Amino acid sequence: MKKEEMIQKAYEIAVERYAAVGVDTEKVLKTMQDFHLSLHCWQADDVTGFEVQAGALSGGIQATGNYPGKARNIDELRADILKAASYIPGTHRLNLHEIYGDFQGKVVDRDQVEPEHFKSWIEWGKEHNMKLDFNSTSFSHPKSGDLSLSNPDEGIRQFWIEHTKRCRAVAEEMGKAQGDPCIMNLWVHDGSKDITVNRMKYRALLKDSLDQIFATEYKNMKDCIESKVFGIGLESYTVGSNDFYIGYGASRNKMVTLDTGHFHPTESVADKVSSLLLYVPELMLHVSRPVRWDSDHVTIMDDPTMELFSEIVRCGALERVHYGLDYFDASINRIGAYVIGSRAAQKCMTRALLEPIAKLREYEANGQGFQRLALLEEEKALPWNAVWDMFCLKNNVPVGEDFIAEIEKYEAEVTSKR
């Protein structure tokens, strides 16, 4: 029996199994078609970027490993991203950091960046049906230090304020050109290695910096703000903590970013979704896999990621959440890393959408705890993978592990020769 026939037969069985618990698999497939990931450009080159005078990676983040074949320039990075996207079902976005501008070999300091430096990206995105998102970049620069937007040195603080203002202008042009808002994330590494006696001072400075940055209103971009529990070399204090950004986001009606690696390992990011959605307009996700710290391992279909996507579906918040990925593993094939992590996130969403939520809520409303728990457990064994396989088949991408050989071929013909 041909593989396509097996996929079709398995799907037909899944349709009946899910119908028995009140789930419409065709509706799930249609919803999945509108589920767009924002692929992070920095997996392709280990967060190096294209600045002429690029600094070493800093800001408490690390890309570990030295697998051969990383992208060395803008053309290679674009080619690798397109290759990865060809194995990911559906249409997706691309998330750029400011250091990935098309600087044409010129020295452009961070406070001098202009929309023109991303003109070729905008054109590329249109050509390949890939809308763009954006990030300001506070790390890997001579003025990064331990503090950027919260720096008491007014000259340095204003440098980063100007940088971030200009990044918002770039994001506005991206959104205008693509006819869809560009989501611009703001994360700064600011913090202290050892005990500080000025917590309030630095947070007041960050608050003032953000107010200056967000003073200009734009129609074609949306801001989101991201916290972190700590970074390497900044273990004792992080200015932009979770509490800080929740307060700022709620008081300023700003989108909050939840990076799954930016919390204590015992915290549930999924549990934060329902609370935040009561107070902020939208959420941005940076889906990663923290191993003991914010290690940015490749996303997999693990319990925390599954719980996160289930909670979004249960909250009825599909339209209020934006789905970005944020990991960078330099120890394995980078195109493979993109595909594994992206498809893992999509698998989690597929399973979340297939949950028999109506029946589960009926049990809960009736106080039928045994029945609710029993169905939650039995649902795990339902053939969600047959629905996922059909989604891949409908989108003309490899089903199952077939992409492995394709990526090996690209490595042999392209990346291994770099």
UniProtKB/Swiss-Prot annotation:
Cofactor: binding details: Binds 1 Mn(2+) ion per subunit.
UniProt main location, coarse: cytoplasm
Protein location: Cytoplasm
Assigned keywords, A-Z: Cytoplasm, Isomerase, Manganese, Metal-binding, Rhamnose metabolism
Pfam families cross-referenced by the UniProt entry: RhaA (PF06134)
Keyword hit for Metal-binding: yes
Listed pathway(s): Carbohydrate degradation; L-rhamnose degradation; glycerone phosphate from L-rhamnose: step 1/3
Ribonucleoprotein recorded as keyword: no
Superkingdom of source: Bacteria
Enzyme Commission designation: 5.3.1.14
Example of a GO cellular component annotation carried by this entry: cytoplasm
HAMAP family hit by this protein: RhaA (MF_00541)
Family under the similarity heading: Belongs to the rhamnose isomerase family.
Function: Catalyzes the interconversion of L-rhamnose and L-rhamnulose.
UniProt xrefs under NCBIfam families: PRK01076.1
Protein name, entry field: L-rhamnose isomerase
Protein's organism: Bacteroides thetaiotaomicron (strain ATCC 29148 / DSM 2079 / JCM 5827 / CCUG 10774 / NCTC 10582 / VPI-5482 / E50)
